[in-house]
Design a protein with these regions (language model features):
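Terminal, non-catalytic protein-protein interaction segments that mediate quaternary/complex assembly
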Residues: 1-229
């Protein structure tokens, strides 16, 4: 299986060869389609922002679907994807811990929008059967095709699901994403997934954890080409 080092080298080589994909806005990207690798490092390019990681984790724990509730200054990227009132879809804490209907939208509430306690479903499944293949936290939902742009937002959830398998007492975490930005996206998402994995590892008394990262489109934006080294 490939490692973060292999993925890093892929992007370095693609940049040197000027193999770019141009998106709908005319911006160049370097893209790896169908990426799959052992997430054995917390960052691919660039340095960790521990302060932001802590603030985002606190927001995830709050399960708030409003970006104005992020502690400290709200990052511009969250403001850009939120609706006019600050609401988004992608609070990952809400995705796995919420057992409630989203009260921010009465239309969606009437449709029964909730995520039904994904974390506890996985915990209970593996507590009852450590060999199970059914321990999956489902992040996105079929209505995302309509939800992503409701009320002016632009937030089509990037994480599809995460599967957890215990083998030889090691917790294997298989992350499945539709899209992931190599620079900021990966390192912040890794920090979140590693945190959740650590909770399960301890709760289920596993002997270590391993994260496998699967992404439909793993990419570097043109503005970050200078970090590819």
């Amino acid at each position: 299986m490939q490692s973060v080092s292999d993925i890093r080298q892929y992007f370095i080589d693609e940049l040197a060869a000027e193999n770019f994909v141009t998106d709908k806005t005319g911006v160049k990207t370097i893209e790896l389609v169908g990426a799959s690798f052992h997430a054995d490092e917390p960052t691919i390019f660039g340095k960790l922002n521990d302060d932001y990681i802590k603030r985002e984790l606190a927001w995830y724990k709050s399960k708030s679907l409003n970006v104005n509730d992020i502690p400290g200054k709200t990052p511009e990227i969250w403001k850009m994807v939120a609706d006019k009132d600050g609401y988004i879809n992608s609070n990952y804490g809400w995705c796995i811990w919420s057992d409630e209907i989203d009260s921010s939208d009465t239309v969606m509430r009437n449709k029964g929008r909730h995520n039904r306690g994904q974390y506890w479903r996985v915990y209970n499944e593996l507590s009852n059967n450590r060999d199970s293949r059914r321990a999956v936290m489902i992040y996105t939902r079929p209505t995302m095709h309509e939800d992503y742009n409701r009320n002016g937002m632009s937030d089509f959830m990037c994480t599809n699901a995460v599967q957890y398998l215990i083998r030889d007492d090691v917790l294997n975490v298989i992350v499945q994403m539709r899209s992931n930005d190599v620079v900021f996206g990966y390192r912040n998402d890794f920090a979140w997934q590693d945190y959740v994995a650590s909770l399960l590892e301890n709760a289920l008394r596993c002997d270590g954890r391993k994260i496998i990262w699967n992404v439909g489109s793993l990419h570097v934006y043109e503005r970050h080409f200078s970090l590819v080294e």
